[in-house]
């Protein structure tokens, strides 16, 4: 099997290079009373950032990209709407499966990242016949947390830098895998959601499979509840899952009546528009698009991949 290595040099730097580029002149002015040292440091970081991005781009020239329409029978703009009764039935079945197979095992983040990256690489290789090796490095903080306060994790698709901003409990393997799909070069959110889910489900690892199913359940609940926070919490309570699982699901949505910060609301709207301008459906691709993708995949008669991958 062909092997390709994306260097991802920027991910091994002790600090996010984009953070250094943005803040070095300001920090230099505040600490030293002069901006020149900061500008020199910023320029050096920019050079490293550009060099890393160029090396990654050159490595990707030989990549075999997954054709989603061919492999799964659908793509961002060709999704079938999943019927509401089918959604509700799926919610009940996933909740039951999660309850029966629950594991409270927690894997240290650096080990989890390596495991997730391995299974993602192998899953994609089974489709393309090519292993694309990438970094497993993850940061705990970047300035993106201030810009996107609603996000649990981010990936700079230019440098491949990934950061997770908080402990995400049972969902963490999926969040890591989602960002690692971006690191491999797939920048559309629907593609990241789908490949992450399918890779984790194929792993056979109870912790990773649980994360995939929990993400699928969470997204179905979001679709059914819409913008109604109380409806979401009522749906979770109605499933009568074990307390540990219910708490994880409740924690993803604010209590009814609580207001998001104005920064979060504004940035969500801007990010939604940015996604639409790049040929995506917007933030809805995280939940409506993702669940519709799995539904369309199972209903497609011309997908190269076996539809049982989307079953559970």
Predicted features by range, described:
Residues 63-115:
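Membrane-interface segments at or immediately adjacent to transmembrane helices
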Residues 1-86, 311-312:
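N-terminal low-structure segments adjacent to metalloprotease catalytic domains
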């Amino acid at each position: 099997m062909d092997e390709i290595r994306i260097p991802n040099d920027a991910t091994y730097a002790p600090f996010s290079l984009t953070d250094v580029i943005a803040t070095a002149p300001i920090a230099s002015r505040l600490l030293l009373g002069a901006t020149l040292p900061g500008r020199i440091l910023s320029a050096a970081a920019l050079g490293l950032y550009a060099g890393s991005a160029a090396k990654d781009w050159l490595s990707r020239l030989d990549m075999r990209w997954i054709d989603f329409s061919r492999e799964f029978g659908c793509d961002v703009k060709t999704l079938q709407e999943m019927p509401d009764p089918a959604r509700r039935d799926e919610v009940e079945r996933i909740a039951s499966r999660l309850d029966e197979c629950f594991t409270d095992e927690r894997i240290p983040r650096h080990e989890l990242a390596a495991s997730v990256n391995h299974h993602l690489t192998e899953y994609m290789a089974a489709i393309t016949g090519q292993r694309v090796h990438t970094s497993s490095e993850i940061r705990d903080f970047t300035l993106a947390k201030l810009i996107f306060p609603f996000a649990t994790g981010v990936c700079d698709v230019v440098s491949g830098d990934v950061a997770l901003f908080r402990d995400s409990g049972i969902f963490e393997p999926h969040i890591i895998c989602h960002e690692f799909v971006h690191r491999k070069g797939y920048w559309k959110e629907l593609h990241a959601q789908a490949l992450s889910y399918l890779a984790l489900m194929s792993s056979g690892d109870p912790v990773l499979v649980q994360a995939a199913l929990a993400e699928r359940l969470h997204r179905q609940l979001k679709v059914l509840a819409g913008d109604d926070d109380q409806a979401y919490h009522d749906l979770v309570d109605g499933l009568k899952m074990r307390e540990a699982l219910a708490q994880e699901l409740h924690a993803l949505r604010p209590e009814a009546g609580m207001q998001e910060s104005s920064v979060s609301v504004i940035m969500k709207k801007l990010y939604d528009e940015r996604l639409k301008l790049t040929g995506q459906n917007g933030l809805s691709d995280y939940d409506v698009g993702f669940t519709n993708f799995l539904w369309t995949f199972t209903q497609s008669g011309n997908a190269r991949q076996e539809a049982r991958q989307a079953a559970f």
